[in-house]
């Protein structure tokens, strides 16, 4: 479990983790990168993972993924890919390239922090300094200097959901009313997503609203609204912010 970057639970209670020991990039001429997508499972229900399965290996910087009935959507810059397990043995059999053209020259700003909305579409964050141009059946889609993508698998439609003065957005979450919130890792700030999502001409940034949650320290490495019975009643609906450098913990906001 080297250099984990994103995790997600499936509907069987198993924890999927993307690991990127090749970060920030592999050395030309050295061995090819072997980043992985792992499945951790508690088979005897003692609260500890006792089984590890390598769902996919020989990857390069899978810094974002999203589980879906048809497979696992995955970052493999410059591509958005789909890992498919044809025989349901918990090992990917195929990797399909769905979209091409996501910028690659700053690996920790590339499409990441995947999060699905209630409709089944999912969001991908992209940081500053990148200039992506992706060909789609609906025409080219572009994102410049930081933004949030939305991909709808049912329509095979990619769109720029938000483009504003972001540094490195790394966290998308939805509240009880399905409103979107966007967190910026570099600055540690948190923004209400809806006012930033209006369709604007390419290259025009949308001004931000006031911060949704107070900044304590940077950077933000994940956010979520509590809606699980694993947490007590008094925690339900609270906004959780994970910090990976400042105070090295998780803050709760009601």
Regions found by a protein language model. Name each.
Residues 1-254:
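Beta-propeller domains with acidic blade repeats across secreted/periplasmic ectodomains
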């Amino acid at each position: 479990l080297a250099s984990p970057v994103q995790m997600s639970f499936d509907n069987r209670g198993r924890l999927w983790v993307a690991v990127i020991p090749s970060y920030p990039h592999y050395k030309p001429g050295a061995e090819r990168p072997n980043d992985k997508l792992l499945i951790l499972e508690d088979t005897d229900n003692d609260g500890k993972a006792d089984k590890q399965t390598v769902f996919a290996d020989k990857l390069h910087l899978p810094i974002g993924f999203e589980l879906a009935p048809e497979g696992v959507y995955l970052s493999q810059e410059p591509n958005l890919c789909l890992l498919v397990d044809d025989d349901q043995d918990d090992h990917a059999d195929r990797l399909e390239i769905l979209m091409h053209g996501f910028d690659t020259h700053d690996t920790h700003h590339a499409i990441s922090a995947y999060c699905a909305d209630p409709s089944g579409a999912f969001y991908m964050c992209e940081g500053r300094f990148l200039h992506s141009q992706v060909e789609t059946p609906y025409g080219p889609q572009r994102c410049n200097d930081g933004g949030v993508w939305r991909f709808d698998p049912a329509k095979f439609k990619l769109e720029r959901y938000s483009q504003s003065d972001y540094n490195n957005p790394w966290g998308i979450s939805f509240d009880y009313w399905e409103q979107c919130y966007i967190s910026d890792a570099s600055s540690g700030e948190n923004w209400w997503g809806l006012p930033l999502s209006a369709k604007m001409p390419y290259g025009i940034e949308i001004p931000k609203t006031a911060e949704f949650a107070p900044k304590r320290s940077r950077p933000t490495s994940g956010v979520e609204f509590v809606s699980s019975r694993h947490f007590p009643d008094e925690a339900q609906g609270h906004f959780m912010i994970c910090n990976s450098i400042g105070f090295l913990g998780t803050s709760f906001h009601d």
